[in-house]
Amino acid sequence: MDKERYSRSHRDDRDRDSSPDHSPQREGGRRRDRDVDSKRRDSDHYRSSRRGDREDERDRTKDRRGRSVERGEREGSRDREKHHHERSHEGSKEKESRSKRKDREEENGARDGKKKSRFADGNGERRSRFEDVAIEVENKDAQVSEGSGATNPTSGVTMGASTYSSIPSEASAAPSQTLLTKVSSISTTDENKASVVRSHEVPGKSSTDGRPLSTAGKSSANLPLDSSALAAKARKALQLQKGLADRLKNLPLLKKATKPTSEGSPHTRVPPSTTTPAVSTGTSFASTLPHTGLAGFGSIANIEAVKRAQELAANMGFHQDREFAPVINLFPGQAPSDMTVAQRPEKPPVLRVDALGREIDEHGNVISVTKPSNLSTLKVNINKKKKDAFQILKPQLEADLKENPYFDTRMGIDEKKILRPKRMSFQFVEEGKWTRDAENLKFKSHFGEAKAKELKVKQAQLAKANDDINPNLIEVSERVPRKEKPKEPIPDVEWWDANVLTNGEYGEITDGTITESHLKIEKLTHYIEHPRPIEPPAEAAPPPPQPLKLTKKEQKKLRTQRRLAKEKEKQEMIRQGLLEPPKAKVKMSNLMKVLGSEATQDPTKLEKEIRTAAAEREQAHTDRNAARKLTPAEKREKKERKLFDDPTTVETIVSVYKIKKLSHPKTRFKVEMNARENRLTGCSVMTDEMSVVVVEGKSKAIKRYGKLMMKRINWEEAERKEGNEDEEEEVNGGNKCWLVWQGSIGKPSFHRFHVHECVTESTAKKVFMDAGVVHYWDLAVNYSDD
């Protein structure tokens, strides 16, 4: 147990010391566990009292340590490989973060205008320091892990086919010396054809956030490297630097040689790349130069040097020079196949506004912006355009009232109210109104106004009549034309001025000037004389609505409610002291209840008073009933109102009856007496062929008389009792009465009811002709039972 515990603690301590990412908390926890174990071993429980036991324990401890060392070496190799892979992964992440930080710094440097340029002596051309480039290439080679296809964060070149051995940086070899790590190096040419190199340097190794990384913890995990390898690597970098410097010395000669050819060349210039292209090193470049198309470049000493210089510049992330674009395009294999050009976003234009809110340019001039036309198709805009296009003229008076000499300004006439159009009120149109108006206009235009009215009346009558015959269409007589009231002539002197003027004429008054000599001063007073009111010639107003006729039950209910309301009002007035309260109704039955002790003092006197009061009350009741009782004249008037209509009504109804035979005296008496009792006018004309009865009167009387003629009198039974039946009458169907026509007229034609017995039809017709209603006889003659 002790050996296993010791080997476990020893292995934990060794792993903790070898691991680069152990935390202080974990170290402190393990240290506390180790102290606890040591205290436990030093306690009395683990202390051995024998010397032999302690020696055995030492032997076991040595054996355990030996085995743990062997196991630790095996496990250490695996741990080192694991840590190596983790560091390589962290290095790739760090390179990516550096590349992102480099891009951000480039953008910030381009935005702020802070460019770091390196100048060279001589012709004033700008050249980059190749020492920095060599150190940058050396750092790149040192950071790329063995066998990995990581991406170089500085130049953006993918190293797919190349493999590099992992070596430590120069900072680990010489810790006292601070090394400048090149984050980015971009070459451009200005308008003076000088090369400009923008570089951003960060001293030492830095993390993604710019803080320096400590290499103390990683030194134990890195493998030991030989100093000869470092020297070889440095020599290689210096050789590469010298070769690149020699090859780029020929760039000015190349520029001078390309000027005459580029000016006379028909080829167009290739626009320079604005950003660093991402070029793959695995891309194949053509090593052979085409024989054709290089006529102007015979003076170039070393074409291969130019090709290799451009290739190295592309690998290190340099921009292509825009003046060498025609030369570079002549090498078909030199352009990278996987070229991606990412344009930088242009800066948005600056909006400048003056104090009034108008847009101005950098010199302060107001920029005229064309106002966009209104393309909206809303109903509001359409109506506005129509209103602007069609100007509505306001109404104007035809003649100015102030120019009229007879216009009185004191009348207070407002011209605005006259010109203001009347607002149309909401009116319902009856069905068929417009059709009737159109027909009336058609008749008026075709027949004239008078003829159109006659046709309208006839059509209305024809609509109410039967299909066979329409008695209303029969012309009664010529219509009496209405007499129009003649207009009064305009007098020479108005009646209100005749009493005031001296001579009663306007002749002496000229130009409207009136003096006291023209007037009767005594007639003038301080009173205002108003003219007599004249009613306008308008139709009479329609009669007011008639009250609703109630049933007997409803009338009783209303009477009870009125009596209760009256009694309640009386009690309220008595309560307020406005009326004297009535005396108590004392009877013999309630004598003791009402009077109490007073009834026992003088019973005889009290009884006499009670009987006298009861007799008075009874007499008052009788008098009230007698006062309410109708007189004989009132009873007769009431009966007349019940039997007959109001005599003031103008309407008169006419009924024409046709009777087959009216020879029986009983039926003749009924016909005559009922007509007179019902106050009907008319006549009864009897002939051998038929009899005609015409009655005129009010609606109630005509209704009762119609029941008599059509229902109450049995015409067939009356003829049988007479005993003068013939076989012809039985064949014809017996005696009968028909209502030929019933209608209303404006004025009655008869003054009383007469009975006429005529021998011939001409005599009977003459009776109706004298009354002016010969058409009644024609109606009866032409009437058929069918």
From Swiss-Prot:
Function statement: Functions in the RNA-directed DNA methylation (RdDM) pathway. Acts as a pre-mRNA splicing factor, likely by affecting Pol V transcripts. Affects DNA methylation of transposable elements (TEs) and preferentially influences NRPD1- and ROS1-targeted loci.
| One record GO biological process | gene silencing by siRNA-directed DNA methylation
> Which superkingdom?
Eukaryota
Does the entry feature the keyword Ion transport, yes or no? no
Q: What keywords are annotated for this sequence in UniProt?
A: mRNA processing, mRNA splicing, Nucleus
Where does this protein have coiled-coil stretches?
Answer: none
Task: State the Pfam families in the record.
Answer: PRP3, Prp3_C
Which ranges are annotated Low complexity under compositional bias? 165-176, 268-283
* The protein's name: Protein RDM16
Q: Which GO terms describe its cellular component?
A: nucleoplasm; U4/U6 x U5 tri-snRNP complex
Q: Which residues does the annotated region (Disordered) include? A: 1-223, 255-283, 532-557, 616-642
User: Would I find Lyase among this entry's keywords?
Assistant: no
Q: Tell me which PANTHER family the record gives.
A: U4/U6-ASSOCIATED RNA SPLICING FACTOR-RELATED, U4_U6 SMALL NUCLEAR RIBONUCLEOPROTEIN PRP3
Q: Would you indicate the residue range of the signal peptide?
A: none
Q: What happens when the gene is disrupted?
A: Embryonic lethality when homozygous.
User: Which InterPro entries does UniProt cross-reference here?
Assistant: Pre-mRNA_splic_Prp3_dom (IPR013881), Prp3 (IPR027104), Prp3_C (IPR010541)
**Intracellular or extracellular location(s):** Nucleus, Nucleoplasm
Where does this chain mainly localize? nucleus
Compositional bias, Basic and acidic residues, is annotated for 1-80, 87-112, 123-143, 190-203
Per the record, where are the segments of Polar residues compositional bias?
145-164, 177-189
Bias kind Pro residues: ranges: 534-547
